[in-house]
């Protein structure tokens, strides 16, 4: 039986908004629709980069829960560095 690999990936970025609020957000680039793609990309580009990568498509729902937990921690003021983010997401990264 051949080994099956997941070739579909979800590209994402965690960033901090450039606006006064400075909230941490995520954008899933490969899931954007045509009507909101340009706006979302511009907002992410104006923000401060925190972490980016590719999620395995088949694991994306579980990965998004982890990303949401990371965002909650960041927005509460916790110091969550790139190494910690990568460790939390490691099982879901492509």
Q: PLM features: residue spans?
A:
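Intrinsic disorder/low-complexity segments
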Residues: 15, 19, 31, 46, ...
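A short, charged, amphipathic alpha-helix used as a generic interaction element across diverse proteins
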Residues: 35-78
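Short, solvent-exposed polar/charged micro-motifs at secondary-structure junctions
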Residues: 24, 64-65, 90-94
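Short intrinsically disordered terminal tails
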Residues: 1-4, 87-94
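Short non-domain terminal segments
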Residues: 10, 27, 49-52, 90
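Short N-terminal "domain-start" leader segments
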Residues: 1-45
